[in-house]
From Swiss-Prot:
Keywords: Cell inner membrane, Cell membrane, Ion transport, Membrane, Metal-binding, Sodium, Sodium transport, Transmembrane, Transmembrane helix, Transport. PANTHER family: SULFATE TRANSPORTER. Residues 38-40, 87-90, 146-170, 212-240, 293-302, 339-341, 391-392 are periplasmic. Hydrogencarbonate binds at T69, A301. This is Bicarbonate transporter BicA. It comes from Synechocystis sp. (strain ATCC 27184 / PCC 6803 / Kazusa). The chain crosses the membrane at residues 12-37, 41-58, 71-86, 91-112, 123-145, 171-185, 197-211, 241-269, 276-292, 303-312, 316-338, 342-357, 370-390, 393-405. Changing L476S: Alters bicarbonate transport. The gene is bicA.
Length: 564
């Protein structure tokens, strides 16, 4: 297996343009996310360089651009705040350790080939937690948007402090933030071809703050340390280890989802197919290295990836070029960033938060499915007010329960029992003949489709509806999968029939279905001679074994079908 991503020089010009353009987009976003996280602008910048470089080098999506993203920043903001509050001296170092641990989780997910399962999550849950993350990012920008420091306590703390924030608003900084949002929102599309709106807003906001409001006390980034970052060795504390592990697992899983969803977008634009497991390994390596050098964790960024592709990027070389361009800018122009107003960065992050919210699905979710909409709203509320683990866990659980209920209801209709020719079951002429000759004494019990645990009740109900018969033919020809619970229900039906002296025949038990019945020792109730591959033969032998019908008091040949 190739260790590195797909890199060649046949598309050098396109990759060069894509990488440079993606770097221009990344610069203001990295600054904004670094400040928003509480780790500082430097952490955001180095996260953009390091995650982007290693994810591009070792990942499985040639055109993916990786960097700190809105969802990852929201989680890291909470991690940094909680660890710094618990240990002011080592909290930030432990937060970077969490980023490294998150990367190790991602590498493990990739090596275990769990990539294909990461995005197998109901869209209502994905939409809900992404929208919740967007709302959190918007709320967390309210304080710097109003020209003040972010209060402690995250979302709840910000909402509680909102009256005080509004009463002490700094109009100039709020004006700069509003101007930033306005430029990003309303910049004409034809201008965006020449310069990304985030960079335009960053430059204009900084120039205006210096030229028009230079004599005012405006909060700015301040000095950014020049030179390469120092090595941040992992720091652990016994009393914080459990929290760090949980935070790392959440951050790692969120990064996996974020990256692979963006990889799907890249596939649709380039008509290629990414390697999800390889991508997770690349993302993990990037985050381990970023945490090791004091950078924020990152994931696949939709905006940067789309811009890269639209500018001509087609191989991982574009991601490597982007990282190198950012590195040169950081080393050569770090001092210029010191004058950037925090309100401008808050405006950029605010707009990112608004964009993360899944407005398209929010507007029509209730038209698609009321239950799905309720799940999405519940996940949003839990994400914003409780935490991401509870939101995703509860959302996935409820969504899966509802899905299983629907599947069980559909599969229950495939459990049928008849004692004469019936339109519900497609029978051949011979099968109809033998059922008619059975005169109600032979019952055909048919199961079809995957038999999951929700169908067990239908099997029991159908079996309980049987009144009188001398022989039962269990047709499993169309059962590709027999779950444990459904197997036990079938075993119970066969055992009860045998105890009542009824002849039992099994048709079409092959593969996984047969192995499951063998493990449950169901065939102890059924002689080997009563196991058939052909339903017609089973019905014929069942009727012949019973002999001629002798009494008018024997069971009626009318249908005893019950369908669920």
């Amino acid at each position: 297996m190739q260790i590195t991503n797909k890199i060649h020089f046949r598309n050098l010009q396109g990759d060069l343009f894509g990488g440079v353009t993606a770097a221009v987009i990344a610069l203001p976003m990295a600054l904004a996310f670094g400040i928003a996280s509480g780790a500082g602008a430097t952490a955001g910048l180095w996260g953009a360089v390091i995650v982007g470089f290693f994810a591009a080098l070792f990942g499985g999506t040639p055109t993916l651009i990786s960097e700190p993203t809105g969802p990852m920043t929201v989680v890291q903001t909470a991690v940094i705040a909680s660890l710094v509050a618990a240990d002011p001296d080592n909290g930030l170092a432990m937060a970077f350790t969490v980023v490294m641990m998150a990367g190790l989780f991602q590498i493990a997910f990739g090596l275990l080939k769990l990539g294909k399962y990461v995005t197998m999550m109901p869209y209502t849950v994905i939409s809900g937690f992404m929208s919740g993350i967007g709302i959190i990012l918007v709320i967390l920008q309210l304080a710097p948007f109003l020209g003040q420091a972010s209060p402690k306590g995250g979302v709840i703390g910000t909402l509680q402090a909102l009256p005080n924030l509004v009463s002490n608003v700094r109009p100039v900084e709020t004006l700069l933030a509003l101007m930033t949002v306005g430029i990003i929102w309303f910049m004409p599309s034809r201008w965006k071809k020449f310069a990304p709106p985030q960079l335009v807003a960053l430059v204009l906001g900084t120039i205006i703050s210096i030229t028009l409001f230079g004599d005012l006390d405006i909060r700015r980034i301040g000095e950014i340390q020049a030179g390469l970052p120092a090595l941040q060795l992992p720091v652990f504390q016994a009393d914080q280890l459990q929290r760090m592990l949980i935070d790392a697992a959440v951050l790692g899983m969120l990064g996996c989802i974020d990256a692979l969803l963006t990889s799907v977008v890249a596939d649709s634009l380039t008509r290629t197919e990414h390697n999800s497991n390889k991508e997770l390994v690349g993302q993990g390596i990037g985050n381990v290295m970023s945490g090791l050098f004091g950078g924020l964790g990152g994931a696949g960024a939709t905006m940067g990836t789309v811009v890269n592709i639209q500018s001509g990027g087609r191989t991982a070389l574009s991601g490597l070029i982007r990282a190198m361009v950012l590195l040169v800018v950081i080393l050569g122009a770090a001092k210029l960033a010191a004058t950037i107003p925090l309100a401008v960065l808050a405006g950029i992050a605010f707009k990112v938060g608004v964009d993360i919210i899944d407005w398209g699905f929010l507007k029509r979710a209730h038209h698609v499915s009321i239950k799905g909409a309720l799940i999405m709203y519940a996940v949003i509320v839990l994400t914003v007010l409780v935490d991401l683990i509870a939101a995703v866990g509860i959302g996935v659980f409820i969504a899966n329960i509802l899905t299983i209920d629907r599947m069980s209801a559909l599969q229950s209709k495939a459990v049928k029992s008849i004692s004469d020719a019936d339109d519900e079951i497609l029978l051949s002429a011979n099968e109809k003949r033998w059922l008619d000759e059975g005169n109600g004494r032979v019952l055909l019990f048919q199961l079809s489709g995957p038999m999951i645990f929700g169908v067990a009740k239908a099997i029991a109900r159908e079996h309980n509806a049987i009144q009188e018969c001398a022989a039962i033919v269990f047709d499993l020809s169309d059962v590709p999968h027999l779950g444990v619970t459904a197997s036990l229900a079938l075993e119970n039906a066969i055992e009860e029939a045998a105890e009542k002296g009824r002849a039992v025949y099994i048709v079409g038990a092959t593969g996984q279905t047969k192995r499951r019945l063998e493990k449950l020792q169901v065939f102890r109730f059924v002689p080997e001679s009563n196991c058939y591959d052909d339903r017609s033969e089973a019905l014929k032998d069942a009727v012949l074994a019973l002999g001629p019908h002798e009494s008018e008091d024997s069971p009626s040949s009318s249908s005893v079908q019950t369908t669920y």
